[in-house]
Amino acid sequence: MSILTAENLAKSYKSRKVVSDVSLTVNSNEIVGLLGPNGAGKTTTFYMVVGLVRQDQGKIVIDGEDISLLPMHNRAQRGIGYLPQEASIFRRLTVYENLMAVLEIRKDLTPQQRREKADELIEEFNISHIRDNLGQALSGGERRRVEIARALAANPKFILLDEPFAGVDPISVSDIKKIITDLRNRGLGVLITDHNVRETLDVCERAYIVGAGKIIATGTPEQVMNDEQVKRVYLGEQFKL
């Protein structure tokens, strides 16, 4: 089993402390939510784990290795996959070419194995019918499926999803949830941050709630929903799944 941990993270911008002493853990085979009100520090925390923002204090560790100083591409080699909020698909490449663009970097695979892996992912994600479509021609839900399939092409241990429900048609939300659950069932650890609180809590097994730069609650969705401080600063009294 693999473990991804963030330990005592802190980040300031000039004199403003955005994140203070935040720690979290994601294990293989689980879905974890990182949530909180706007300006609470959740996105900065998420970006520190991804490698987009350098922490002032604390460290990021994967399977006992400190990766805090590694750039994103080296973190990817250690097993961290990342799906950004904005469209990351190569718009002028077909779906198949998008997958092969990542698989070509896999030195552990032969050319034949790369082609076979692309075919497997296309079948698994039910995107055979758009295999030869350009990225720019895909719907929001199709694009998300291709982007997640492409992230898996790198064979990650963990996948970090930034706003996976953003820009997705309501009819596709259940598809995205199923894909996220399938990622967990493959043995991956999944960390999600999203403004769509209801959908995120519905799919995750544990959640961390960030408030004013600190973790104010952690536990199952039911536990954090019933936390009085979380109700007061984030969810309100009437929130239900």
From Swiss-Prot:
It is a peripheral membrane protein. CDD domains: ABC_YhbG. It is found in: Cytoplasm; Cell inner membrane. Residues 4-237 form the ABC transporter domain. GO terms for cellular component: ATP-binding cassette (ABC) transporter complex; cytoplasm; plasma membrane. GO terms for molecular function: ATP binding; ATP hydrolysis activity. Its EC number is 7.5.2.-. The keyword DNA damage does not apply. Part of the ABC transporter complex LptBFG involved in the translocation of lipopolysaccharide (LPS) from the inner membrane to the outer membrane. Probably responsible for energy coupling to the transport system. This is Lipopolysaccharide export system ATP-binding protein LptB.
